[in-house]
UniProtKB/Swiss-Prot annotation:
One of its GO terms (molecular function) is G protein-coupled receptor activity. Keywords: Cell membrane, G-protein coupled receptor, Glycoprotein, Membrane, Olfaction, Receptor, Sensory transduction, Transducer, Transmembrane, Transmembrane helix. Residues 1-25, 80-100, 159-195, 260-272 are extracellular. It is found in: Cell membrane. One of its GO terms (cellular component) is plasma membrane. PROSITE patterns: G_PROTEIN_RECEP_F1_1, G_PROTEIN_RECEP_F1_2. This is Olfactory receptor 2Z1. Disulfide bonds: none annotated. InterPro entries: GPCR_Rhodpsn, GPCR_Rhodpsn_7TM, Olfact_rcpt. GO terms for biological process: detection of chemical stimulus involved in sensory perception of smell. It is a multi-pass membrane protein. Its main location: membrane.
Length: 314
């Protein structure tokens, strides 16, 4: 109990992403620019889905939730990292570390569930178009959204409580730019082997099972697309689904490396790069992937800009 109390009273010292780089100012500038681009991109996408009635469909409702997660995930880590860099220190309180673990895990797991639901939406739209209005009615969409949040909260609560239950009575220096479960477990003076094994095992349920469901959904979609006679319908289906598959590959690839590959097989520098990838790079790319390849989003943006231009002229 004394060890636990000592842990509560102490701060963690985050080494930070920029300590491993010679050109710290340049890397900081790149991270800051990506953060702003991602924040603006996801905010604009949320706004367009909100104001354009043509985007009031199940697919865009789920996409708006993805944008919400992609706004929240970088907000948990990047402002704190930037503040530490500008102040020249990396101390974070025990409560602050717990908050980072909880909210990042919540949004990461919830986004993983959401990607499965988005693949189901595309499966129904392409393979069962006549039943789409029933299978993807508003109540079902709200249930999908709620389930992703519930699964995220439950998983985050369990992981945070177990991780912070271990005593951290040795080094308080976290070789990472935010408090994350794998990085903290390396500092514990207790035996964490069983929990690390449980993390890898749970990765099968949290990561590999959803990934297999997504692959199955898009396998059926691919079969249906190849049998389509209309070139326009085939092109639209391929464009939409390829965007989803790109997002899935970026998100799950980084998550599998971080949480299913044993810590002994990757260095802290690799952990920093991979964590930056799913906490900043992927949320920044997602709105670009969906908007650049989606004519409906472009039309909504043009419509909003046209209205703004007409108001200024009047």
């Amino acid at each position: 109990m004394g060890d636990v109390n000592q842990s509560v009273a102490s701060d963690f010292i985050l080494v930070g992403l920029f300590s491993h780089s010679g050109s710290r100012q340049l890397l900081f500038s790149l991270v800051a620019v990506m953060f702003v681009i991602g924040l603006l991109g996801n905010t604009v996408l949320l706004f367009l889905i909100r104001v354009d009635s043509r985007l009031h469909t199940p697919m865009y409702f789920l996409l708006s939730q993805l944008s919400l997660f992609d706004i929240g995930c970088p907000m948990v880590t990047i402002p704190k990292m930037a503040s530490d860099f500008l102040r020249g220190e990396g101390a974070t309180s025990y409560g602050g570390g717990a908050a980072q673990i909880f909210f990042l895990t919540l949004m990461g797991v919830a986004e993983g569930v959401l990607l499965v639901l988005m693949s189901y939406d595309r499966y129904v739209a392409v393979c069962q178009p006549l039943q789409y209005p029933v299978l993807m009615r508003r109540q079902v969409c709200l249930l999908m959204m709620g389930s992703s949040w519930v699964v995220g909260v439950l998983n985050a609560s369990i992981q945070t409580s177990i991780t912070l239950h271990f005593p951290y009575c040795a080094s308080r220096i976290v070789d990472h730019f935010f408090c994350e479960v794998p990085a903290l477990l390396k500092l514990s003076c207790a035996d964490t082997c069983a929990y690390e094994m449980a993390l890898s095992t749970s990765g099968v349920l949290i990561l590999m099972l959803p990934l297999s469901l997504i692959a199955t959904s898009y396998g059926h979609v691919l079969q249906a697309v190849l049998s389509m006679r209309s070139e326009e319908a085939r092109h639209k289906a391929v464009t939409t689904c390829s965007s989803h598959i790109t997002v899935v590959g970026l998100f799950y690839g980084a998550a599998v490396f971080m949480y299913m590959v044993p810590c002994a097989y990757h260095s802290p520098q690799q952990d920093n790069v991979v964590s930056l990838f799913y906490s900043l790079v992927t949320p920044t790319l997602n709105p670009l992937i969906y908007s650049l390849r989606n004519p409906e989003v472009w039309m909504a943006l043009v419509k909003v800009l046209s209205r703004a231009g007409l108001r200024q002229m009047c």
